[in-house]
Amino acid sequence: LPCRVRSIEALAPDVRCIRLQLPFSERLEYLAGQYVDLIFPDGVRRSYSMATAPGTLEDVELHIRHLPGGHFTDRVFGVGSRPPLKEREIFRLEGPFGTFFLREDSDKAVVLLASGTGFAPIKAIVERITALQAAGSFRRPVRLYWGGRRPADLYHDALCRQWEKDLADFQYVPVLSDARP
């Protein structure tokens, strides 16, 4: 599928949220937790997990951490020799892929573990759980452990704390290896 960069937003000094717009006539069918491949004009592919549950947004949301020297991430952060990524730029998207997704028919507790931008598919899964709880079809305990070195690495900490208030039987446990700010 072709996709267009709708927006680029800083979530943390080294993390950006990129929203990709699909053609109006296309819908991407996927399960919360799956990933897509971005295919660049030179044929290089990069895989990124989608950070929104199906049906919550028309856009595909990706969380990108800067890896210095990275083919795509240097462009996202406007460093290196390639031109910086701009809104309205077009890429190809392929997918969905992956077997990491919420098993909605299970009766077992849900334990979610994430580190860094590995939070993206977890965010999509919790958004799906939110929709299921609102419909009255999800009654399982959920525990989310999100790890990082510093508090700033948990770039959606406030969102996780809001989920803890809003969702039934949901617990958020931030895990830091270096708690100094």
What are these regions (language model features)?
Residues 1, 7-11:
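Edge strands and adjacent loops of beta-rich recognition modules
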Residues 57, 85, 137-139, 165-167:
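Short, well-ordered coil/turn elements that cap or connect secondary structure elements
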Residues 141-181:
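Reductase modules of NAD(P)H-dependent flavoproteins
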